[in-house]
Amino acid sequence: MTEFLPFVARHIGPRHEDERAMLAALGLPSMETLITQAVPASIRLNRALNLPAALSEADALAELGTIMGRNVVKKSFIGAGYHGVHTPPVIQRNLFENPAWYTAYTPYQSEISQGRLELLFHFQTLVAELTGLPVACASLLDEATAVAEAIGVACRHHRDKRSRILLAGELHPQTVDVVNTRAEPLGWEIATGSDVDDNTAAIVVPWPDTRGVYGDFAKVIADAKAKGALVIAVADPLALTIMEAPARWGADMAVGSMQRYGVPMGFGGPHAAYLAVSEALTRIIPGRIVGQSVDAHGRAAYRLALQTREQHIRRDKATSNICTAQALLANMAAAFAIWHGPAGLQAIATRVAALAARFAAALKAAGVEIAGESLFDTVTAKVPGKAAAIAAEADKGGRLIRIIDADTVGVTFDETSTEEDLTALASLFGAKPVGGDTVLVPGKERGEGFLTQEVFHSHRSETEMMRFLRRLADKDLALDRAMIPLGSCTMKLNAAAEMMPVSWNTVANLHPFAPAEQVQGYAKMTSDLEAWLCEITGFAGVSLQPNAGSQGEYAGLMAIRHYHQARGQGHRNICLIPSSAHGTNPASASMAGMSVVVVNCRPDGDIDIDDLKAKAEKHRDNLAAFMITYPSTYGVFEEGIKAFCEIVHDNGGQVYFDGANLNALVGLARPADIGADVCHMNLHKTFCIPHGGGGPGVGPIGVAKHLVPYLPGHVEAGSEHAVAAAQFGSASILVITWMYIRMMGGAGLKKATEAAILNANYIAHRLKGVYPILYTGAHDRVAHECIVDTRVLKDSAGITVEDVAKRLIDYGFHAPTMSWPVAGTLMIEPTESEPKLEIDRLCDAMIAIAGEAKKVADGVWPADDNPLANAPHTASDTLATEWKHPYTREEAVFPGGAFDPTAKYWPPVSRVDNVGGDRNLICSCPPVAAYG
């Protein structure tokens, strides 16, 4: 009988014989010897992780299926920002469940990201068309955080000289909660009503409000304009297909959730939010913006634009700490709009609006008082003393409605609602619906044509749509094609067995505010995950709410802030951050109301302990926190980590441990044991949630016992300080991490960490004779990544790090992290999932590139005309009739000679003009009329 390999062996790339060969190359007798050399003995965990034993893929799927089977999936009419959807199967199968889409990284390397960049460009076009505003970003995390981000834009617009924010109508409670969390450390004054004064930075207009009502905001908008305050519309994007665009009635910004564009509720996420702004606000908008530029041969090409706004460049002066957003879900929303086209979207919206209007008419005829006269999809009914009883009766019939208070219920229709639902719901109120197609949306209908661009009219058949999505995917390089050796990004395997449950009905189709007794599967799964993450990190409590690593940072720092305040030490506001830190660290600290003081690093990359001590003592009366990444952002285990923590604690501060590099620690060491008080964990790095081409991500935080009371709360749970719209953030993708841990077990997780460290040290060993390895720890070892100093090529041949990165595309690779944390270098992280064959292929390519640079240095190839300077090479360029370069076509596209031509990746564009793209920003496709 065949003995099947356990999942651990499927997940880890190097075979046993490969491991022996790699260790031999390092001159080591065993893996334990390597770990002893690389990881300081002072931090080592000297016991096995106390986790359930590993299960096979089949058994883990069965166990999770049983757990999630405890969820009771009923049809939701709760609304409140979450809606039932019909995800088109062609999109679910060819995009959402396709590794070509979900395993890709954020598209910093534009030449190998043209497919997802193009679809994100269409997403921005969709948002711009719906809102009437010219500039949209390529998604934010959820509606609640998008509102908070828009408020931040308004305050920056006024150069922080205005701090009052007027909530002009009733927003969803979770949105108000997130806004209040964001407001406190930044000094925003949150007000309600209609009084606009000279200190008002912005008014926030819900369109519609949480009760489904479109209010009359004409006067408050006019007052805002007169006082110079910005107008932020929180608008339903499905309603906007049949209603006047917010820009037409005075909105300077519009935000909302694109969830109902084909993305399941998922018990709260992940979903893409949108943010659109007027042209005047372009350079202070948060998040990614996809812009159109040209490549070296003048072909249209897409790229991430205006990156100087972002945290990785501006740090504590950034417009936001947003890093990961929701690219995969934004692409689903764009595909949904392309699939249905404007007429299809309007048909869905009109049908939903008609159901709601007929329901409202039926209730009125039965003598039931409803809120407002103008509505789109939601009817709020006054039922004195009967709300719970009516909701219970609806529940018996398999439908969930919203209890707003003891006397009020809300019923929200969506594209899944039927005539049968309408009749059944009306009967709960003693009413009977009548026919008709009247809608009750306010103001002018959308008169102007919208989405006239060809892409929204060209893919009506499934054959066309399937091929469209395939063509886009073929333009990109994701993990399904090749290794993505990005340092600090942990692009490991996202196993099929981990991904499958995300599409299950019991995972995808629950409303986040469904009754607790109906979501016991989620309760068990999240409880398991919290306990396992506590064991892995050593912490006393975990919050799964933060829906990105950046939000985890923010949540952790806010926990520290609230802890100090509770002890009467709210004056503590100094955050010490090493100069080597990732840009989100200072950006998050600023958002948490802290002032950043930079701690120097020594020439060998380690934190300067004397500088840390001096600055901690200098600020001891006001020290709030010290943020440290471990292993360091330079890819080494610093021996002094425990001493760093002691210095901070001795001076009254808390230690924030950035978990970006947790993949080098799991099973070997635990942040809490090292001395950390709080740590965020990137589930989209260490724990196998895919990057999705720029999101989703999940960044839960673990905290020590004294910080547990200050973990994020949620209004639906009767607490506050939420950092995301839903209590469990992007809940549906937590099953990916549950599956990973359940199939690996404690021993498997430790083995994965060891393999990641081995792979990185093997790469450093193979390349160190050609490129300097910039930083190493004791015994000349690195952690799970290494910095390769390509500046030697610049010195000898004028070849830049960008030339090397683009040339790697010709070799079939996504470039490593470029110019971070050290300018002019590449940081390589192979992860444990890459086999030795692929690792050797990367090393061979890097060595071959050094050989090509030598030809430039020796004058064989001119400095301005060589394979590196001209990289990457497209098929069309290579097949051109004339070839005037001093190197051959074969050298251009099949470099090194030993690479498999059948596996060749062809970039769709040559090198993209970044400077020109920023100077001439184009971030949405003009309507057809613009070409007239």
Swiss-Prot record:
CDD domains: GDC-P. Its cofactor is pyridoxal 5'-phosphate. GO terms for biological process: glycine decarboxylation via glycine cleavage system. It comes from the Bacteria. It catalyses: N(6)-[(R)-lipoyl]-L-lysyl-[glycine-cleavage complex H protein] + glycine + H(+) = N(6)-[(R)-S(8)-aminomethyldihydrolipoyl]-L-lysyl-[glycine-cleavage complex H protein] + CO2. It holds the Pfam family GcvP2_C. Its EC number is 1.4.4.2. The keyword Oxidoreductase applies. The glycine cleavage system is composed of four proteins: P, T, L and H. Belongs to the GcvP family. The glycine cleavage system catalyzes the degradation of glycine. The P protein binds the alpha-amino group of glycine through its pyridoxal phosphate cofactor; CO(2) is released and the remaining methylamine moiety is then transferred to the lipoamide cofactor of the H protein. This is Glycine dehydrogenase (decarboxylating). It comes from Brucella melitensis biotype 2 (strain ATCC 23457). The gene is gcvP.
